[in-house]
Amino acid sequence: MNSWWGRLMMKRLCRLVWLLPLTAVLLFTLVSLAPIDPVQAYVGARMSMIGPEQQAAIEAAWGLDQPGWIRFFHWLAHLVQGDLGDSISYNAPVLTVLVERFPASLALMGCSFLAAFVVGSGLGVLAAACQGRWPDRLIRGWAMVISVSPGFWIALLFISIFAVQLAWLPSCCALPPGVTQDEAHWWQYGRHLVLPVLTLSIYGTGPLILHVRQRLIGFLDGPSARHLRLHGMSSTRLALGPGSRHALGSAVTVHLASIGELFGGSVLAETIFAWPGLGQATVKAATGADAPLLLGIALVTVVVVLLGNLLADILAAWVDPRLRIMPQEETLPRLKRLPWLKASARLKTASRLKVEPKS
Amino acid sequence: MKRVMVSIVSIVTRSDDTGKSYRLALFMAIVVTLMIWGGGALPDTMMAVNPAQRSLAPSWQHWLGTDLLGRDMASRTLAGLAQSLKVGLLAAALSTLLAMVMGMMAALNRSLDRLVSSLTDMMLGMPHFVLLIMVAYAFGGGTVGVTWAVALTHWPRLARLLRHEAKTLVKSDYVQVSRSLGRSNLWLARHHLMPHLMPQWIAGFVVIFPHAILHEAGLSFIGLGIEPHLPSIGVMLANSLNAMLAGFWWVVLAPGLGLMLVAFGFERLGERLRRQALPPDRGSSGVSPGQVA
Amino acid sequence: MIFLLVFHTLVFSYWVFHIQSLVDAALGMRNVGERDSASGIDWVIQGVRGLSLMRLRRPLMALFSMALLCSVGFSAASVQARSLVLAIQGEPETGFDPIMGWGRYGHPLFQSTLLRFDPQMNLQGDLATSWVLSDDRLVWRITLRDDAVFSDGTPLTAEDVVFTFNTARDADGLADVKALKQARVVNDHTVELVLNKPRITFLNELVSLGIVPKATYGQGYARHPVGSGPFQMVEWREGAQLVVKPNPYWYGQSIPFERVTFVFGGEQTGLTLARTGQAQMVAVPPAQADQPPEGMHLLSVKSVDNRGIAFPVVPAEGQTTVSGAPIGNRVTADRAIRVAVNQGLDRDALVQLALNGHGRPALGPVDGLPWNNPQAHQVSYDPDAARKTLNAAGWVDQDGDGIRERDGVKARFKLYYAAADSTRQALALGAAQQLALIGIQVEPVGASWNEIKHYMHQSPVVMGWGALSAGEMRNLYSGATAGQGYFNTGFYQNAEVDQHMAQAEAAASYEDSLAQWQAAQWDGHTGFGVKGDAPWAWMVNLQHTYWVSDCLETGPLQIHPHGHGFPITHDLPSWRWTCEP
């Protein structure tokens, strides 16, 4: 645990210790506040065939006849044992539902994450390299436009163009109808992935383009770039070589920190494309008053986002050694060190990350 | 009165950056007023179901075509935007108010400060949309649910910023003097903090606003937002899926484009105000959307 | 912008091509279990490393892979001969466990039931060869066929039936078998079901409860069902599709399809599949049903999926329910108002307005079912008759504001409807317009069910029911269910109606019970029909609309219950394919 990433992990673990319980309490409070009657949501249209006796039995089986705080401790006790409870709308343990649906979401989000990074940073570099000329303006305009357009609307436009008008790509599902997983070819997966991933990734590129562009311009205007240019390095090579390295390190951080947004986008994308993943389950849980499943999904996404942030920090420090917490700082007296270290680290990070002013 | 008018005119007609901001702000304010007023005052006949005019392509009579039930898309879009703007305004106002209260509480009381900052941390650590869904669910969905959902999830960044500002203010001499004169925290907040935090507060409001309407549309789209019998962009887009698959593209184009234009206008305005009123963010000043909202 | 779109597509398709291993690992985790989860992170890292200089060579590669993707995509014919794809929604998210409620509507596919209704609603044996009710109406003695075999090859015996019924009685799912006292084995092929009290509607359980194997029923059953029905499961990808194939052990006729696929997802999924010719049957919303694509035709199925107005029939005297909801309405407590509403509703116009013409007027709660009594609900659109009814009862417009009044009470009420349901909204608004013509002022109020729950004993509400069991009718009109849940919201009570329904429940057979059910609606001097107390004003019965391939012959269809979609599978095993494969 002496390495820099070990220290980082320790710090984050401490954060988890207070953050997770607080989150759990908040989330549980939220779902217990809901005025929706889960029994009614469960029974739905069959209300006429389910007598009052049976309804009472269902209520008792879910423990809904007990006060909120007792239910909370029940839930907590099970949670500690790794049991997230049973999903009402799927009639299966929440964990099973999550495990069942995670792969599809992972494929969708993973591809979108990578695609967004590649395209976003690529366009950012391009914009910075052509600063002020038409590609730059075009790309900046594009980034602005997509950051204010609703993601689900973009999805609808894509379906309209590629699936309905041109009929190139399927607009729904993960596989063609009638094909089982065993019979499916990889390209069938690929074809069905294209539109959802396109939608989801476009949404994530906006901030990334602007960020990379800003960082790269900052570098190109800086003294080191001026120095290299004087030595005869062409602008293109400058932008693609050392410039990209400078910009992409922090781009990774920015991008990883947006994992939460990605999940939000996937809820909408999965609804539109009938993608059998977690997003679909989220909507089902929320509209079907399935509190245990909603809680489970929320907790899992919180953990994923925290992991994403941790990964972002580790990657950032890995790319840029200056961001690591150096071992010699460890030798300072413990009591005084903590506040001082925090402040100084923040200062240093700040000064290093700061964009050099344009001359 | 005359002096006020003159100063407004002089500000609006200035040719520098500030003048541009004010012109944009005035323009957006007019747009919003017109929409809320116009959207609410549309005659019912324009929005009534009309089986004889189903799925008509855009024409002179129906500028943006009609939907599957024969309703005029232009009127529906306008009414939907009005609904979205109302919810967005209310939610953004609540949200910024919450941020203001939180920020000032944190600055004036140390134990509250810890509470506020850990709450802020927690809210920022959670995926935004999931939190929105949870809060909307907690309020049982509907217009009330979506308003609260947006209001209760968009305050943390602004609160963090206002807290920082307010803390600097509290340390300044005149606040310290007031405090030693025995002024209560409430008095300090009212007379010293609030006036100084106003510009940031207004900028925060404008920056949050486009997010509020976009998220409202998203929630309505998945069925947790505005009830389907009210016109709203999210619901219209959700219903347009079927029509679009039959090739009626205009049903999708109009509402989305309208929403995007309004959001874009406010985004630009927010960007300008933010540059003037809020301190620059470190590292990534170009990244506008996620910064304050 | 278009340039960027194309650029995005190209670069992206390159990625699709190359991250296949990740997709495989992710989507096929069950099969490709040996891949470790680190591969995702590897890709991130490699992606970052490879970014800086390799970019320029990639568009070419991407172009190539894009072309490849498209070409292989077009040559794919996914529908094999004689396999059927149905996009009729209604995925049972809770799985295929009859004990938890699977198979209530439509065919349970995997399991078989003791009895079944034929398309004309006559009772037939399925697993049962004879079913006899004891003289005290408490014990059903059921003889089972001896050739029923589960799809895993084990024979179905009396043990399995007894196990299924006893487990369902104790389970907390959507199969309400609480009327059962106990099921017991008589011999290998005979069982006895003992009831708590006489209840002929228990037949509904014999019709809908699929029999599960005692030996293998357990935790995972809902997702891997085994039964003695016509089909067995091939694969269920939750949220996406269910694939089934004929069960070789089934005792029924041979099924002409190698495979039947149910595609889930929203309405738009079905519409897309229909337009691309990938599905042979699709459930479509009525608003869009009129233009089926090439090669398909519209199938509009009658149903008892009804919508009507439930009136509070007791006057407001300050009483409330346990939860504090006020009871009673002084306007609708008058029978004349309720009858006038029934006479003043132009139901044909409502069908056009709210259902795009895909429906039929509803006069009673069970139109077209064997236990319906058409005499009880004789009413037609007649505003003059409605005005006469109101005048005779003393409701007259004295102040000329268009609204009638009596003893200072205006003839007006709020009409609640579920705001999320556009059909109900259209019905409420339409009804309000029509009733204004006869001097009754109706104020439609859209609300959530939680709000409606509070006001439904005080104000009329637009409700929808429609089960294929007379038990539902009993729940809606019995004095015993007054104020219980959504059943009898208006606190309607008529001792004679209750008496008839109790006699119906105590009937010796299904056929014998029908006369008593009909008498409850109108027995010559009272009943709950419009002729009698008229506690409801029924408006419309929905018609469920489907697009069906011209090659698919579904035969006669059973009248549909509440719920668009799955009920159409009721006679799926007897469907035929009429074209060459």
Predicted feature descriptions by range:
Chain A
Residues 67-111:
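Individual transmembrane alpha-helix segments
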Residues 20-29, 145-162, 254-260:
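Hydrophobic alpha-helical membrane-insertion segments
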Residues 10-16:
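N-terminal signal-anchor/signal peptide hydrophobic helix marking the start
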